[in-house]
């Protein structure tokens, strides 16, 4: 436990030193800013920087960043390597090292010497030969081509009026010289001011047929010589119209809503103009603002994409048709034209029918939904109101003052019994009750006579209220019998309740005999029970 404070103090003391180590990049060694290199040799420029965190380095030459596109330059972790230096490689080189705390720059000035005697110049530790000349540097080097990848194409064909550049980049020790020849004859005259824009490149512009031939570059120094030959063919332009090659365009079928394309190949001495046209069908001329006449038929010009040049000297163009519809079906032609004329070829496009079934007519639904909401709601409501009014009127007109007795149905006979006494005055199955309803007049009260009763009839006023019209209906009930009091005659049949009896009974009560047959006539109900 006693060692813990001491260990803690030791760790705390080490923290400042660790923080002090972190910082911007710093120089790890001295450099010689002035570097001298011989032509055609390899140069290495060091960038001795360090830091925590480790810095990232970037090289520039005369303010331009050196990247992988510079074929003879290679950026290494420890510096920059330049192979087979040329005179154009001379300049100011800067190595810039950067981390999260800052940056540091290391500057070099590179001088390229054409020929140097031993001991006359000391390129320094950063140079290609160190502090003193080695035996290899004192020897001569034969010339050699440094960019053979740019010399692979030795046969070049160009049309009249075009240009061509022939390259023969080489290096050697001492610095080699280059000489150009045509058909084994030395070129003594420059055809243009930019004929030799660079030392190792021959530029031929505005070619003419007489410029065709073999061009040879000869590179030599004291150690030897090398050469390379190019064959240039200047093609005389033939004055002819373009020719459509191959079988395209061809007839094509596409699904409804699908995508397809036509293609067209045109051979021409110069880059032609390729245009796609679509024939205007009969009756649809008014839908197009402008048309052209080809072969006696009218066509509309379609948008055309880029024209691609092919290695065989032909030109290619494609027409893309996306989301095909029935309107896209028809004849298409590819037209190739130049200053000498034009050629064309036609093809047909067929669009298959839409597999989806047609939907309901849109015009009918739009006209229905276009009505205002009050009209849509009010028309059915008004119809319901009118229908209800008509039904109510019909119900009112069906009500009659009193139906004739002869038209009422005759129910079955129910003999009098003791059930009448049990139910009291509420249920009178054996009473003969005739009801005659008349609207708007007060009739006689009801007379209910029990059999064998000598007391006067009980009076039960009946008042019906119509729930629809709120009018009061008075009913009169009369006791009917066929025989006299004490008679043993059978109950009178209901056939005696004819119109004459009813007309006589409605104003007053008449007794016909023993109350053995009960008949209840209701005007509103239209039945006899």
From Swiss-Prot:
Keywords: Cell membrane, Cytoplasmic vesicle, Disulfide bond, Glycoprotein, Golgi apparatus, Immunoglobulin domain, Membrane, Receptor, Repeat, Signal, Transmembrane, Transmembrane helix. It is a single-pass type I membrane protein. CDD domains: IgI_2_FGFRL1-like. Residues 21-374 are extracellular. Residues 1-20 form the signal peptide. Disulfide bonds join 47-95, 168-217, 264-334. Glycans are attached at residues 107, 227, 251, 289. One of its GO terms (biological process) is negative regulation of cell population proliferation. GO terms for molecular function: fibroblast growth factor binding; fibroblast growth factor receptor activity; heparin binding; identical protein binding. PROSITE patterns: IG_LIKE. GO terms for cellular component: cell-cell contact zone; Golgi apparatus; Golgi membrane; plasma membrane; transport vesicle; transport vesicle membrane. Its main location: membrane. PANTHER family: FIBROBLAST GROWTH FACTOR RECEPTOR, FIBROBLAST GROWTH FACTOR RECEPTOR-LIKE 1. Interacts with FGF2 with a low affinity. Has a negative effect on cell proliferation. This is Fibroblast growth factor receptor-like 1. The lineage of its organism: Eukaryota, Metazoa, Chordata, Craniata, Vertebrata. The gene is Fgfrl1.
